[in-house]
Design a protein with these regions (language model features):
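Conserved beta-strand signature within the Rossmann-like core of class I S-adenosyl-L-methionine
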Residues: 155-164
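Class I SAM-dependent methyltransferase Rossmann-like catalytic core
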Residues: 23-49, 53-54
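C-terminal alpha-helical "lid/dimerization" subdomain adjacent to the S-adenosyl-L-methionine
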Residues: 164-208, 217
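A conserved beta-strand element that flanks and buttresses the S-adenosyl-L-methionine
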Residues: 131
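A short, conserved alpha-helix within the catalytic core of class I
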Residues: 139-151
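Core SAM-dependent methyltransferase catalytic element
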Residues: 215-233
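Class I SAM-dependent methyltransferase SAM/SAH-binding core
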Residues: 66-68, 72-119
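N-terminal auxiliary segments of SAM/dcSAM-dependent transferases
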Residues: 1-19
């Protein structure tokens, strides 16, 4: 995950907060995160958000999708196939501070720059859609607000922010699911910390308002929140 110039949340610690973490451990953890995205609602949340933005767009035209904090690149990679079946041509790009993560994303077919979300090497309105999934909760409130504003400035068409909805049942469900899938102890601990760092619906709405965007916030299966908005070019 990209920390860079953004302040990391003081609520617990996660392996992926540290860009200097052991590459082998990062790789294993990101593979488990990708499995969690598939089975616990992360990929479905992204599809939902993208669907809201793509539904009014003409089919067949290339659409650039920038995934900030792309991890292993599994979410944009899956989104490309999903969109293709609906007549949309997504062109994915990733941004990651972690070099091992960037390498994984590139190997999955997602071109990935090594950079931080606080200072992305991109011009304003340089991509069509910006995706930021399960990234905002890693940061302080002030930095998450800054991240939202960065997304809004980069996107020509719209933004999808997907994150975790905090709750006791979410933690219980993750404990059961991560055990069933055989996640390692580090991934389990990081997942529980991520849930603790997650948002309520009201918290995410308030954060977006402070950031200056008028977004639609939806609750989705798997204790997910998805915010979408169209940008003003």
């Amino acid at each position: 995950m990209m920390t860079g110039h953004l302040g990391v949340s003081s609520l617990g610690t996660e392996l992926l907060d540290d860009p200097a973490a052991d590459p082998a451990v990062v790789t294993r953890s990101l593979h488990n995160v990708a499995r969690a995205n598939r089975w616990f609602g992360g990929a479905a949340a992204v599809r939902y958000g993208l669907g809201l933005l793509l539904r009014d767009l003409p089919r067949g035209q290339p659409i650039t999708l920038l995934d900030l904090g792309t991890g292993a690149g599994d979410l944009p990679r899956r989104a490309v196939g999903w969109a293709r079946r609906r007549g949309h041509l997504l062109r994915p790009l990733g941004l990651e501070l972690s070099r091992p993560a960037a390498a994984l994303a590139a190997s999955a077919g997602v071109p990935c720059a090594v950079a931080c979300a606080g200072a992305p090497p991109l011009k304003q309105r340089s991509v069509d859609i910006v995706l930021v999934s399960q990234v905002a909760h890693h940061f302080t409130r002030e930095s998450a607000i800054r991240l939202v504003r960065t997304c809004d400035a980069l996107a020509r068409l719209g933004v999808v922010v997907a994150d975790l909805r905090r709750g006791r049942l979410a933690s219980l469900a993750f404990r059961v699911g991560s055990t069933a899938l055989g996640f390692d102890p580090i991934t389990k601990a990081d997942g529980l910390t991520s849930i603790r760092r997650g948002y309520t619906t009201g918290e995410l709405r308030e954060l977006l308002l402070v950031a200056g965007v008028r977004a639609r916030v939806s609750r989705r299966p798997g204790y997910r929140l998805v915010a979408t908005w169209r940008t003003v070019s």
